[in-house]
Swiss-Prot record:
Function: Involved in microtubule organization by the microtubule organizing center, the spindle pole body (SPB). Probably part of the microtubule attachment site at the SPB.
Organism annotation: Saccharomyces cerevisiae (strain ATCC 204508 / S288c) (Baker's yeast)
Assembly behavior: Interacts with TUB4, SPC72 and SPC97.
Molecular function GO labels: gamma-tubulin binding
Keyword presence, Protein transport: no
GO CC annotations on file: cytoplasm; gamma-tubulin complex; gamma-tubulin small complex; inner plaque of spindle pole body; microtubule; nucleus; outer plaque of spindle pole body; spindle pole
Entry keyword set: Cytoplasm, Cytoskeleton, Microtubule, Nucleus, Phosphoprotein
UniProt keyword Ribosomal protein present: no
Pfam families with a match to the protein in the record: GCP_C_terminal, GCP_N_terminal
Taxonomy of the source species: Eukaryota, Fungi, Dikarya, Ascomycota, Saccharomycotina
Gene: SPC98
Name by which UniProt lists this protein: Spindle pole body component SPC98
Amino acid sequence: MELEPTLFGIIEALAPQLLSQSHLQTFVSDVVNLLRSSTKSATQLGPLIDFYKLQSLDSPETTIMWHKIEKFLDALFGIQNTDDMVKYLSVFQSLLPSNYRAKIVQKSSGLNMENLANHEHLLSPVRAPSIYTEASFENMDRFSERRSMVSSPNRYVPSSTYSSVTLRQLSNPYYVNTIPEEDILKYVSYTLLATTSALFPFDHEQIQIPSKIPNFESGLLHLIFEAGLLYQSLGYKVEKFRMLNISPMKKALIIEISEELQNYTAFVNNLVSSGTVVSLKSLYREIYENIIRLRIYCRFTEHLEELSGDTFLIELNIFKSHGDLTIRKIATNLFNSMISLYYEYLMNWLTKGLLRATYGEFFIAENTDTNGTDDDFIYHIPIEFNQERVPAFIPKELAYKIFMIGKSYIFLEKYCKEVQWTNEFSKKYHVLYQSNSYRGISTNFFEIINDQYSEIVNHTNQILNQKFHYRDVVFALKNILLMGKSDFMDALIEKANDILATPSDSLPNYKLTRVLQEAVQLSSLRHLMNSPRNSSVINGLDARVLDLGHGSVGWDVFTLDYILYPPLSLVLNVNRPFGRKEYLRIFNFLWRFKKNNYFYQKEMLKSNDIIRSFKKIRGYNPLIRDIINKLSRISILRTQFQQFNSKMESYYLNCIIEENFKEMTRKLQRTENKSQNQFDLIRLNNGTIELNGILTPKAEVLTKSSSSKPQKHAIEKTLNIDELESVHNTFLTNILSHKLFATNTSEISVGDYSGQPYPTSLVLLLNSVYEFVKVYCNLNDIGYEIFIKMNLNDHEASNGLLGKFNTNLKEIVSQYKNFKDRLYIFRADLKNDGDEELFLLSKSLR
């Protein structure tokens, strides 16, 4: 079949009488030349058609005809090969009405019942075949108008050919090689249960859909088979975690998923056996809800291996309030299955203080250091509270009470040896929690916890105070290690004077212990030793010798310590190993004042005796008068040093230690039962006495005014063991963080004038005080030797001693001037600090 004659016949059929035969022949020839040109382009067609439009009549009918011709030729220009053009024209020719086909000499081979089965030979090679199936309409040439011309009359009168062929007859050839829907339904049930089949084999968690399934059914299968893939994924997780040693909460989650998979299997089997599924559409409609449920279960188990059970519980608790009812229902079901196990964790901790088999799924955990020893546990209970892991359905404050209940139980049972009481306590609340188990974590559960917390904390305080004398020990620490009882320190120094003057490497420990006992008997602390009830309080007192190296004397290395044993060692931080050793640091600092004061008192008495001795010499001459005057004047300088030492000691003891101790005891008094006639009073600066805080109402008033239990309105707060330790640590921290004590970089206050931290400036001043008293001691010794020589009338020796006497006088004056200069700068630093207390201290140091 030739190109030009066929094209001529088709154009003549599309636009009869549009052009004369000669013009039409010329037009077709020009078009064929363009089609055969190697540089052909559809843009060349426009000018050619415009030229021949001028040769025809201008009317609406001719415009429509030219539009049809242009549209037809546009599709033809899209074909590259001449043979393909001829095939295209042949197909197009067969679609023309029969009365026009008679005019065309060539035989038609277009779209009809005969050639539809072999339509692949007519397809254009321009478009790639469909990825779905070869028998798809998607594979027909987009450059042609076959689909549009088949589906619409295109202004032509339908011929007998169209009326005799139905749409099914036209489409049946496309489905000859496809798989019927009935056969697909026979195999789908296997795939839904993640079982491979001949039609739909599984390949590494993928389902292979045959290419002979039409596009529509293939799309439905993509949706339906999601259930099979989800079922396979969940089944794999169930089998995997059944073989592992996982926590009970995760096991409960796996059991729930396993039951859901069993229900899904039964549903699929019933669906297949019922015969209600007649198409893929109906199958998808029936299984859609199960797909949604399996999706939700897969979402919840997405990170099952990495996350802990309590994390799942927290997440499920959030989804319990989800807007989607299906998600809410599934989350609630899973939450209820896991919360019972979490309730057991709580019960074991609340009634027995046990953390066994929690698998790290609890907000309370053991914190045992692998490098630690058994001795470390006498200072702390190795249990920690992780606030970040507290679930949202338990209030943070209540979670802390839960933590303290179990910790207090361990404290009483293991450290206080209250075995009988803890057993009765455990049985009592085990019954209460067991009876509340059907309610779960509810308001009633919270009320039981509040009552249990109050009971165990009150009993803990009672045991600490009555059995282990907690408050007595606190006051003993303040009176001894913080030098609250000055008579004890004076007696101790007086008794240990000779021992402290010996070298540190030869200090006998047994003598220090004996001196310590004698000092207690001579002081106001003797009631602690003489009372059988309080003897354990004073028994913890111990004398220690610091290791400062060779050349030190007892005064430099002596210190006091207090040895605590459980349970008090857990609530009172007294020089714990690897700690800051707060009491040791404070004692050693205050020891400087006591040491200086002792030597000044000693030298003052010695100087007074020397002066009185000189006055008794016969022949009271001007030389003796001069010596007496010089000693008296030096005594005035000594008094200024001594006053500075006493003022600073008083400030440390009264304004720093005593004030912080009062604050601590006010907090500790909350744990005691006060009578209604005892009030907490404070004295203002002007001497006025006022009530500290608000006067609390009587318990009877609260009972009559409300039907609630009086315990719910308790105003006084009882401190638990952690709070007792915290109060004591705060007391020590506040002392050491004071500007005159602080040594930490973040707490140090540097003087504006000296450029030194206040404690450093003060230590230098105290060293000056001590150096002064040493020179002053030498002066007194020389003065005493002069007195002896004068009594013996050894004037030559007296003259030599007078030279030494005057040299020491000059050194004393020099040290005094140096001290006054340092004191002036120190006072300026305090005055310029901006702190009112330090400003008043600077004024008192004038």
